[in-house]
Amino acid sequence: MSIKYLMLLFAAMIIRSLADSGNAIETTSPEITNATTDIPAIRLCGPEGDGYCLHGDCIHARDIDGMYCRCSHGYTGIRCQHVVLVDYQRSGKPDTTTSYIPSLGIVLVLVGIIITCCLLSVYMFTRRTKLPIQDMVVLYFL
């Protein structure tokens, strides 16, 4: 991993934690003492950020100077300029190799049960009739 990617990841984690915390800043003035004013942790850039992010929203963080991009789904990069390849995205479609494996297992178990039942019926028939298996094979093919 490159250092730029690590820095971007760290900045995104800081921005996300600031957005989730919603801290208030204490201010004092001659008229009002210890009042709290809510300043949003993240706000949109406004007109100065138009066109900065190619596929996403331009944002300002309260504790970090500069503009940052919140990328739309399917895009990544500092300015959301890179398309995420389909191979790396998690898609809702199941993988074709894993979707038929349970069906194949059930079919194999059923075939095994059918073969076992056939062998048991042949065995019971030979015990009941006291015919050797060679004679029974001749009877089946006549």
From Swiss-Prot:
GO molecular function terms noted in the UniProt entry: epidermal growth factor receptor binding; growth factor activity
Extracellular side: 20-104
SUPFAM superfamilies: EGF/Laminin
Listed PANTHER family: PROEPIREGULIN, TRANSFORMING GROWTH FACTOR ALPHA
Family: Belongs to the orthopoxvirus OPG019 family.
GO cellular component: a single term: extracellular space
Name of the protein in its database record: Pro-Viral epidermal growth factor
Glycosylation sites: 34
Transmembrane segments: 105-125
Feature type site, description Cleavage (By host ADAM10 protease): 96-97
PTM description: Cleaved at the cell surface by host ADAM10, thereby releasing the secreted form of VGF.
Signal peptide (UniProt feature, chain positions): 1-19
Cytoplasmic face of the membrane: 126-142
Cysteine-cysteine disulfides: 71-80
Keyword Coiled coil listed: no
GO terms for biological process, alphabetical: epidermal growth factor receptor signaling pathway; positive regulation of cell population proliferation; positive regulation of mitotic nuclear division
Native species: Monkeypox virus
Induction: Expressed in the early phase of the viral replicative cycle.
Keywords for this protein: Disulfide bond, Early protein, EGF-like domain, Glycoprotein, Growth factor, Host membrane, Host-virus interaction, Membrane, Secreted, Signal, Transmembrane, Transmembrane helix
Entries under InterPro entries matching the protein: EGF-like_dom (IPR000742), GF_C11R (IPR011170)
